[in-house]
Design a protein with these regions (language model features):
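Nucleotidyltransferase catalytic core that binds NTPs
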Residues: 1-209
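Short beta-strand-centered aromatic/proline hotspots
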Residues: 213
Length: 213
């Protein structure tokens, strides 16, 4: 897998589940892009790696840190240079055809990325859903998460992270996204919760379990 994950979401988690299932007992790698800007890529490379490992602990050891890998082509070169002769890439359903065409175009050909030559070419498998890095309003996309962070809506932001990450780390992630977007950090995380005087949600809030996702 090669992804932006800026920020990571439960959609990325589903993609990684498919990756692990597809790999079976074979090794698999997760590469993250290193692009960073204050519009669509607010998180730094190091922050993405850190938070992805917290969000997806099952796959933490497979999340690779390699400053030389900045594109899918770089990732394939690194995998080929490690001795692998065959490779399967897992991607969102809307990216499968694009990856099949572009990545196989350079199979066996040298380029700026280096060289890779996999037997049977690069096989690209659909994760069964659209690319969680895609822009738009479909599903729990990274673009929606950036919007929640911009609005300071921690409730919806946290819902898009899943259950593995702690409340404290979820808050740090939202503030890291805000900072990368050029916004001030926020401490008023619970302003979006409207509680009735007596309710189960109020008791969860008081006991500190409401945001234990």
């Amino acid at each position: 897998v090669f992804g932006r994950m800026n920020p990571p979401t439960i959609g990325h988690g589903r993609l990684l589940d498919v990756l692990a299932k597809q790999a079976g007992r074979n090794n698999y790698r997760i590469y993250l892009s290193q692009s960073q800007n204050n519009k669509k890529d607010p998180l730094s490379y190091s922050d993405k790696v850190k938070f992805c490992r917290k969000m997806f602990p099952r796959y933490a050891r497979s999340i690779i840190i390699d400053n030389k890998v900045k594109t899918p082509f770089d990732a394939l070169t690194a995998i080929y240079n490690s001795g692998c002769k065959k490779v399967v890439m897992v991607a969102g359903s809307d990216r499968v055809d694009e990856y099949k065409t572009r990545l196989n175009l350079y199979n066996g050909k040298k380029g700026k990325h280096g060289f890779y030559n996999f037997e049977d070419g690069i096989k690209v498998v659909s994760a069964g859903a659209r690319d969680p890095d895609a822009e738009g309003v479909e599903g729990m996309s990274a673009s929606k998460m950036r919007k929640y962070a911009t609005d300071g809506d921690f409730t919806k932001f946290a819902q898009g992270l899943g259950k593995s990450i702690s409340t404290a780390d979820a808050r740090k992630l939202m503030n890291a996204v805000r900072s990368g977007l050029g916004l001030r950090e926020t401490t008023s995380f619970q302003n979006h919760i409207q509680l009735s005087p007596v309710s189960e949600r109020r008791e969860q809030f008081v006991s500190g379990t409401l945001f234990e996702l």
